[in-house]
Amino acid sequence: NIALPLQIEGQSKKMIKEKVNEFLEKVGLNHREKYYPQQLSGGEKQRVSIARALVKNPLVILADEPTGNLDPNVSDEILDLLEIATDSGAAVLMSTHNFPLIQPRKKRFIELDEGRLVTQ
């Protein structure tokens, strides 16, 4: 699953394995390397999705509720990964209903209520 973007790009099997292992570790799933998606919990599937999105170091990341179904500790770890992506030059546009999770991070955010701008 995480390897797919790298396979499409035609990367070597060795490089793909290294990158997949690196990102499985980053999202705390290195112990689940051989599992099929149906064997993973909802939160674990969410973390695999984040790893797949980050594995190619994209310039733009669109994240719709990336911390949904995750416990608070894993949510913080995922936001840390997204912050690392921004530090590397990526733009992250994230939607969330969990304002207390993102507010302390002091990143630029906008708040919408019924489609209207409330805070910028």
What are these regions (language model features)?
Residues 15-27:
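ABC nucleotide-binding domain "signature" region
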Residues 72-74:
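Helix N-cap at the start of a conserved alpha-helix in ABC-type nucleotide-binding domains
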